[in-house]
Amino acid sequence: MTEPAKLPWSDWLPQQRWYAGRNRRLTGAEPSVIVGLRDDLDLVLVDADYADGSRDRYQVLVRWDAAPVSEYSTVATIGAADDRTGFDALYDDEAPQFLLSLIDSSAVRSASGAEVRFAKEPDAQLPLEAMAHVSDAEQSNTSVIFDRDAIFKVFRRVSSGINPDIELNRVLGRAGNPHVARLLGTYEMAGADGTPETAWPLGMVTEFAANAAEGWAMATASVRDLFAEGDLYAHEVGGDFAGESYRLGEAVASVHATLAETLGTSQAAFPVDNVLARLSSTAALVPELTEYAATIEERFAKLATETITVQRVHGDLHLGQVLRTPESWLLIDFEGEPGQPLEERRAPDSPLRDVAGVLRSFEYAAYGPLVEQGAQNTDKQLAARAREWVERNRTAFCDGYAAASGIDPRDSAPLLAAYELDKAVYEAGYEARHRPGWLPIPLRSIARLTTA
């Protein structure tokens, strides 16, 4: 059990795409929990400490000696300890199947006061013989796909508490909602008092949506088709996305209705303090926000005395979080806004938070190609066509949502606009840090929303 402590964690962690400390200086990283799953496989929780006093805890499954799949050898190799080499086990040929078998048998593994519990959902069938490969998708966790049957999401940055991705998938699946992939199993480290509130969720397995297309890919393909047909309106182009936007609106409304029925609703004040705090911190980073700040503050302040209906929602919904299967739309990744504490990600919010997320995603799908081409400020015709595409799909989505729920988001225009503004402010901060070339997209939207 001493070998994991000898691995070069401070060198390896910052190289991983799921590492969350890129804007902080790492001062040290060492294992805090080591649980042996078998002789050549350890579950390790690594505490990463930063110069600002903060700490993250990461989960790494370490396979000893066995060579990983060759194409991943560099990213998977952690380093040497004594006479053995440690690898990220998720890239191994066989270790993921073993982890799946632990879930299938509802196994328990213990060491040094830590207990890891694997659990299969009732009546779940796990593909124990399926071939496994790591998904190439950029994300904050690591997903392993088992043929066309299941996807195993291993949480990387972990914390104690009820994980909303597991919680909401379970609730929606057991309620029979058709717009989520069925939860098959989970695993967690037990907390000090044995309750879900103190447990450390570590991963989950759901059905894999074979033959599914990502909403983002479908939407951007539609935009490219529109741009290629300079003499046609959006509804005349073969790749028109409005029908899918309508059906997506129906799916989101269905999920919201199930969550409201099963977990309830309540009344709460509009979170004016939270949105103003985000605006203040982002404006300090993005000087371009200064000219809009007073108007945004005024819009938010008008809602300060409003009482709104809140419930559990997705929390970070956009076109990259939805999949189109041959039968319907599926919503995935119910983790909420990345980087926020679990308690905040589980907090009830207005369903308009999710609606605004999709509407903002339409803006990105339409204007992203212009940014990539460097044409966002020069090609007036393409910009006009992008706006046409956005408005057509906004309308279709809201129409579908209203048809399925009986509640039209546009009837709460000031509140919906406030959630859109809050999301655009968040996007401005993200783009300023990571993709400055994309900053005009949220800034353009903020200008439009503050003059509407």
UniProtKB/Swiss-Prot annotation:
Enzyme Commission identifier(s): 2.7.1.175
GO molecular function: ATP binding; kinase activity
Gene3D superfamilies the record matches: 3.90.1200.10
Pathway: Glycan biosynthesis; glycogen biosynthesis
Group of enzyme by EC: transferase
One biological process term in Gene Ontology: glycogen biosynthetic process
Keywords, ordered alphabetically: ATP-binding, Carbohydrate metabolism, Glycogen biosynthesis, Glycogen metabolism, Kinase, Nucleotide-binding, Transferase
Domain of life of the organism encoding this protein: Bacteria
Homology family: Belongs to the aminoglycoside phosphotransferase family.
Protein name, as recorded: Maltokinase
Source species: Mycolicibacterium paratuberculosis (strain ATCC BAA-968 / K-10) (Mycobacterium paratuberculosis)
Gene: mak
